[in-house]
Amino acid sequence: MAKEIKYGSEARAALGAGVDKLANTVRVTLGPKGRNVVLDKSYGAPLITNDGVTIAKEVELEDAFENMGAQLVKEVATKTNDVAGDGTTTATVLTQAMVQEGMKNLEAGANPIVLRRGMKKATDKAVEALKDMSQKVKGKEQIAKVAAISAGDEEVGNLVADAMEKVTNDGVITIEESKTMQTELDLVEGMQFDRGYLSAYMCTDMDKMEAVLDDPYILITDKKISNIQDILPLLEKIVQAGARLLIIAEDVEGEALTTLIVNKLRGTFNVVAVKAPGYGDRRKAMLEDIAILTGGQVISSDLGLELKDTTIDMLGRAKSVKVQKENTVIVDGAGDKDAIAGRVSQIRGQIDETTSEFDKEKLQERLAKMAGGVAVIRVGAATETEMKEAKLRMEDALNATRAAVEEGIIAGGGSAYIHASKKVAELVDTLEGDEKTGAKVILKALEAPLYYIAANAGLEGAVIINKVKESAPGTGFNAATEEYVDMVDNGILDPVKVTRSALQNATSVASTLLTTESAVATIKEDTPAMPAGAGAGMGMM
């Protein structure tokens, strides 16, 4: 396939045009008075959103060289989203500013490699300044503010803060679409896993179709139970004690299941059987989690234990167990606190070591069930279009709060970059030649987020930047009220992780793009149209 090649300033100009087209589309969403972008979908209703990475992913340009530039910016947005979960629009705006400023200097004869070195030094200095300005998140109120700024909605902020407070940092918060118009928060206390009763005859409440066992014994095994004789001695002891039993096994089938159901219906004893959660090695780990949480033992051949030898003191205990068609929740397990703490730190260690995102997610879920809890935010809206937009904003808010808890917060609204630029200006004075020019590129780019926040509010960015520069650290411009205020006191906060990641990723891509001297793209070949009448005449067969 034939290729087209462009060199020097022509190649850079084409890439720069692609960067501008994508960045100009995304930057209209920045700030409290930012607008939305409507995205055409190949099926269903268009998507209306202000989420930078969602917009960036949709942009494909016709010109191959311009498209390469756009794809590079898309990488900045995606990488920032992966690391921090928010700040994608800021990262895009920073990249555009760096590319525009850098290209001017290259045309004036700057050396791109030395320029890049200066950009890297200035970025490191700015990141250091951002970290120095950071403060730890204090209380639920600040968490709510971080979420509200990210989503542009106070109600969302309060909901996310409630969820974070209830499940703690180890908990898992998931976001789902609601069946109603209301947005609500559901909290699952205790250990929940997605397996339900093996037979509806085991229900204790036929109206709700669920089985509730108070203070039950819990048999945990990775074996199949098909012969009732295997667990008969144990069942007799349970009946004598007048207790209830939850069986968690690989499966309960045949004669064993029939006998359990018949005795349940006769009222001989109250028993519920569920399948073990997970598969393979993950199943073994989850059964071990349940055993530690309830103070029982996993009856497994791996440990040399057989069902027929099981005694009552090998069983777990819990305050209550609720079993539905597809879920089981164990509340207040009777496990030893030290053993549970040991298991939690073991899972944390595995999370730190694993490189697989999938494994990390599953381990995080296990950690939440052991230590925190699981909260589900169900997002409701009048139409599907509004619901999808609200769900994206909710996800951004959740990611922003997690980032804030992790690395702390700083003044929001682009003002942190302005105050960090004072440190970069000091560095610029110590550099020489094109390194100095590279550092100045970053110095100029740090003004871009505040400039566009002001521009989207219909104000003159340059004037506002100068006023913020002259003010005390922590002071910034509140574009919603058009006032200069102490940003942290007024709840206009950004997570350091988001601010830092956006700057580092923008510099990484922009400095690499500026070192480009030639670009190669595939020439699109027009596919000839099918001649008229081709395919006709088949009826003659």
UniProtKB/Swiss-Prot annotation:
GO terms for molecular function: ATP binding; ATP-dependent protein folding chaperone; isomerase activity; unfolded protein binding. ATP binds at T29, L30, G31, P32, D86, G87, T88, T89, T90, G413, N478, A479, A480, D494. SUPFAM superfamilies: GroEL apical domain-like, GroEL equatorial domain-like, GroEL-intermediate domain like. It catalyses: ATP + H2O + a folded polypeptide = ADP + phosphate + an unfolded polypeptide. Keywords: ATP-binding, Chaperone, Cytoplasm, Isomerase, Nucleotide-binding. Together with its co-chaperonin GroES, plays an essential role in assisting protein folding. The GroEL-GroES system forms a nano-cage that allows encapsulation of the non-native substrate proteins and provides a physical environment optimized to promote and accelerate protein folding. Belongs to the chaperonin (HSP60) family. This is Chaperonin GroEL. The gene is groEL.
